[in-house]
Every structure is written in C-alpha cells, then in structure tokens.
Regions:
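Membrane-embedded transport module
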Residues: 1-112, 133-136
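C-terminal transmembrane module of polytopic membrane proteins
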Residues: 80, 86-173
Length: 173
C-alpha cells in the first residue's frame, strides 16, 4: 500500500525493484522460521472469526501505512533524493515486517517477550543484512548512517504506537 500511495501522490515508486526482490526474500526467511517460535499454545481447536481477523489485519496494515506515508511525505517535502527515499523505504519495510512479527506473536507488548532462538537469529540476520545493503549501497542507493538512524527511529516509534493500540484491543476480545 505504501508503494502504491507513493506512486499516486509523488509520481514515482518509492522503492527500487532490486530492493523489492530482496525484501520479499528476506521477509520469507522469517516466515519460514515462524513455526519454531515460542508462543502461547492452546489445547483446544481455534475458532477464528474471519471478519474480526480481517479488521485486525487491516488496522495493523493501516497503522504501518499511515506512519510510513507520513514519513515518505516528510522526506519528499524536505528535499531528500528519490534514491535515498527508496532505500529508506526499503529499510522501513524490512523493519516493519520484523517488528509486526514481534507485535503479533505474543499477548504481551513486543518489548516484554522474545522470540525463539531461530526466529531471533533470522530476524537479526535480516536486519543486519538490510543495514549493510543500505549503508554500502549494494543493490540499492547508498544512504548515510544518519538516514539509517532516522528510519530506524521512525520504525521503532511506529511499532510502539501500533503495539500500544493493538495489545489492549486484543486483550478485550
């Protein structure tokens, strides 16, 4: 959604195609490891309310998208180059994917619990590779440490805001 809105409002796709491919592969690595995670186990069959799940998923996606679009808008309005924005969006999307796993995997706030060793290793590896690619300009435009830190702070603030809203809603279901 963030890329679509970026194109509609700014007349360019705010992420390089190379970065899209890398993002997909890196995100799938965590998805494949999620079965090893240490989460809350129920001993009775789950009864999923698909309409409720869709609302929750849309709300989470909307939160990340609104904050991400605000971030991209700020960068565009304050003179960042399209290349820098592209890499910063890539970093933001990778971090949002890693953080959403942490947010939705537990009944606690994401900073109060930790994933399984394998999920944690894959997430840390994904984030480290993302930072290396962004800082070295491999397969995407190079960004500075300052731009990387700005993006990390935005993603972390977004995760905290989203989780502060998400957890009380989930506890009252």
């Amino acid at each position: 959604m963030l890329l679509t809105f970026g194109y509609l409002f700014f007349n360019y796709i705010p992420m390089a195609l190379n970065a899209m491919v890398i993002y997909t592969v890196m995100n799938n690595m965590v998805t494949m490891m999620i079965g090893t995670d240490r989460t809350h186990i129920t001993y009775k069959p789950e009864n999923w309310n698909m309409a409720r799940l869709a609302k929750i998923a849309f709300s989470l996606a909307a939160g990340w998208t609104i904050i991400g679009f605000t971030f991209v808008s700020y960068l565009n309005l304050h003179g960042w180059s399209h290349n820098s924005i592209s890499t910063m969006v890539y970093v933001y999307l990778v971090l949002s994917a890693m953080l959403i796993v942490l947010i939705t995997r537990t009944r606690k706030y994401f900073w109060q619990d930790y994933p399984s060793k394998l999920v944690g290793i894959v997430q840390i590896t994904d984030v480290a590779l993302t930072f290396i690619l962004a800082l070295c300009g491999l397969a995407m435009a190079q960004i500075s440490w300052q731009n990387l830190l700005i993006t990390v702070v935005v993603a972390l603030v977004a995760a905290v805001i989203i989780d502060l809203i998400y957890q009380p809603v989930m506890k009252n279901r």
